[in-house]
Amino acid sequence: MERLAIYPGTFDPFTNGHLDVLERALTIFDKVYIVLAENSKKSSLFTVDERCSMIREITASTSGVSVEVLHGGLLAEYAHSVGATAIVRGLRQVKDFEYEFQLSLLNRHLNPEVTTVFLMPNVKYTYVASSIIREVALLGGDVSKFVHPCVLAMLKKKYEEQNAQ
């Protein structure tokens, strides 16, 4: 039986920390669905299509990965619909745990067959967050050690377009 998991997030943008968690998840699961979820509480720099495109480019040579978009609905229901028994979440710091723990309990209530698996990234990514990457890139800082080259190019392009307006 194939072990399936979903790895949800806004991934705005997808960082090397996200990639590290994905690679760790693939040592446990046969297939991981990266699920881009829209978050109404966050304003996105990149469109869903741009984020999907970048993640697909980054994971093109990685077997066992599928990039999907959740258009509304509950994550626990989506997990059930694809046959996933786990939701993968990355934890960088202790402060991430409280929120993620609440979500895991809710998802478990909504779908008792799904378990949340918390994975810690390599220590060199524990302070890397998409919001920090966006801000540093906006201010002209070098984020090349924290994102894939395609993400770096898209960040530069996006901020050049914004500055031209």
Swiss-Prot record:
Domain of life according to the entry: Bacteria
Keywords: ATP-binding, Coenzyme A biosynthesis, Cytoplasm, Magnesium, Nucleotide-binding, Nucleotidyltransferase, Transferase
InterPro entries in UniProt: Cyt_trans-like, PPAT, Rossmann-like_a/b/a_fold
Gene Ontology CC annotations of this record: cytoplasm
Disulphide linkage map: none
Cofactor(s) demanded: Mg(2+)
Reactions catalysed, as given in the entry: (R)-4'-phosphopantetheine + ATP + H(+) = 3'-dephospho-CoA + diphosphate
Site features described as Transition state stabilizer, chain residue numbers: H18
Localization, UniProt: Cytoplasm
Main subcellular location of this protein, as a coarse class: cytoplasm
Binding site for substrate: T10, K42, L75, R89
Binding site residues for ATP: T10, F11, H18, G90, L91, R92, E100, Y125, T126, Y127, V128, A129, S130, S131
Enzyme Commission number(s) of this protein: 2.7.7.3
Pathway(s) the chain acts in: Cofactor biosynthesis; coenzyme A biosynthesis; CoA from (R)-pantothenate: step 4/5
GO molecular function: ATP binding; pantetheine-phosphate adenylyltransferase activity
Similarity comment: family membership: Belongs to the bacterial CoaD family.
Subunit structure: Homohexamer.
Annotated function: Reversibly transfers an adenylyl group from ATP to 4'-phosphopantetheine, yielding dephospho-CoA (dPCoA) and pyrophosphate.
Stated name of the protein: Phosphopantetheine adenylyltransferase
The organism of origin for this protein: Chlorobium phaeobacteroides (strain BS1)
Gene that this polypeptide is encoded by: coaD
